[in-house]
């Protein structure tokens, strides 16, 4: 039996790297659906009905700077916000960072 010495691992590494990239590309594919406001309102109503026994409801709010929605989970008895998804603080931070970066990058419209 003749076993040749492998001088480099580059061909093996290239094949591994290609497989990993192909797998990542397939994992990132998420179908995007367009949802109208009426459909969204209907879905929120159904979720609130589902949450009635737990005494909380959902409220969708539009972030003023990012123009993206986030969800507030609100306790019915006290009207207190229990949780925000994603947290509004994070969205504020992201908006501030994009505004800061926008000062350095000339945006063409």
From Swiss-Prot:
SUPFAM superfamilies: FlaG-like. Pfam families: FlaG. It comes from the Bacteria. This is Uncharacterized protein YvyC. It comes from Bacillus subtilis (strain 168). The gene is yvyC.
């Amino acid at each position: 039996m003749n076993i040749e010495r492998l001088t480099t691992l580059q061909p093996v590494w290239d094949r591994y790297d290609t497989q990993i990239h192909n797998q990542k590309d397939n994992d990132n594919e998420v179908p995007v659906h367009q949802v109208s406001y009426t459909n969204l309102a209907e879905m929120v109503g159904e979720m609130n009905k589902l949450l009635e026994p737990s005494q909380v409801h959902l409220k969708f709010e539009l972030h003023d700077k990012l123009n993206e929605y986030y969800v507030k989970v609100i306790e019915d008895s006290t009207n207190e916000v229990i949780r925000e998804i994603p947290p509004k603080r994070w969205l504020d931070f992201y908006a501030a960072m994009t505004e800061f970066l926008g000062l350095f990058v000339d945006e063409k419209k």
